[in-house]
C-alpha cells in the first residue's frame, strides 16, 4: 500500500508523520435497505456486539468473556487469554467471508447472507469439537433458526490458538456471514447477527449437557 500525503521530500513528510504511525480507512456506518449494514471492522465488531448482550444474561456457571486483540497478526491475544483462563469449552464469535456476489457460484461462495449463523466443522487452522458442532445445529433446528456451514475449508480465527492451548480446549466458532471481509465496507444482514446471537445464547446454556 502506497500512501501519498503530498509531501515534497523527506523533511516535509516528517512534519506530518512519524515512522510507525498508524493509518486506517475512513468509512461511515451506513444502513443498506431494510436489514443490511455497511461498516469497517465488522469482523469483529459483530462478535463484540453479541458478547456484550451475552454478558447481560448473567450465565449460571463461571463464564469468561474475552475481547481479544491482534487476531489478524498471529492470534496473539487469544493465545494469552486461553493460557490464562484454561476453560473447559470456548466459543469464538466473529464474522466470516461470504462471497455470495455476482460471478461467484457453488461452493466458492463459502457462505451466504440471509442464511443465518455460520457454524464451521473445520477451517484452515482448526478442527472444531464435533459434539459442540452437532449441538449447535440441533439447537438451530429446535428453535427454527437459520444456520449454515462453510462450503469450503477457508479462513481461520482465534480458535486456531485456543483449541491447542494446554491439554487442548473444546472449541466452536459461530460466525456472522460478511461480504467484503477485512475491507472498509463490510456488509452483513442484521437478521444474521440476531440469529447468531440467539443461537449462541441457547448454546451457552446447554453446554453442560455435553
Where are these regions (language model features)?
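N-terminal hydrophobic/helix-forming segments and targeting peptides
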Residues: 1-210
Amino acid at each position: 500500500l502506497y500512501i501519498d500525503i503530498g509531501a515534497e521530500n523527506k523533511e516535509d513528510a516528517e512534519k506530518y508523520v512519524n515512522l510507525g504511525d498508524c493509518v486506517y480507512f475512513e468509512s461511515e456506518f451506513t444502513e443498506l435497505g431494510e436489514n443490511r449494514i455497511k461498516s469497517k471492522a465488522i469482523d469483529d465488531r459483530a462478535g463484540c456486539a453479541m458478547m456484550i448482550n451475552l454478558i447481560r444474561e448473567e450465565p449460571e456457571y463461571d463464564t469468561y468473556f474475552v475481547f481479544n486483540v491482534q487476531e489478524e497478526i498471529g492470534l496473539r491475544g487469544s493465545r494469552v487469554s486461553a493460557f490464562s483462563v484454561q476453560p473447559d469449552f470456548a466459543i469464538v464469535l466473529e464474522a466470516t467471508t461470504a462471497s455470495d456476489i455476482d460471478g461467484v457460484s457453488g461452493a466458492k461462495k463459502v457462505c451466504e447472507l440471509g442464511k443465518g449463523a455460520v457454524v464451521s466443522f473445520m477451517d484452515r487452522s482448526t478442527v472444531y469439537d464435533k459434539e459442540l458442532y452437532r449441538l449447535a445445529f440441533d439447537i438451530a433446528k429446535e428453535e427454527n433458526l437459520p444456520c449454515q456451514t462453510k462450503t469450503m475449508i477457508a479462513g481461520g480465527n482465534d480458535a486456531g490458538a485456543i483449541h491447542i492451548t494446554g491439554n487442548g480446549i473444546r472449541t466452536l466458532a459461530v460466525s456472522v456471514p460478511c461480504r467484503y471481509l477485512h475491507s472498509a465496507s463490510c456488509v452483513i444482514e442484521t437478521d444474521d447477527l440476531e440469529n447468531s446471537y440467539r443461537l449462541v445464547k441457547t448454546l451457552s446454556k446447554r453446554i453442560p449437557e455435553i
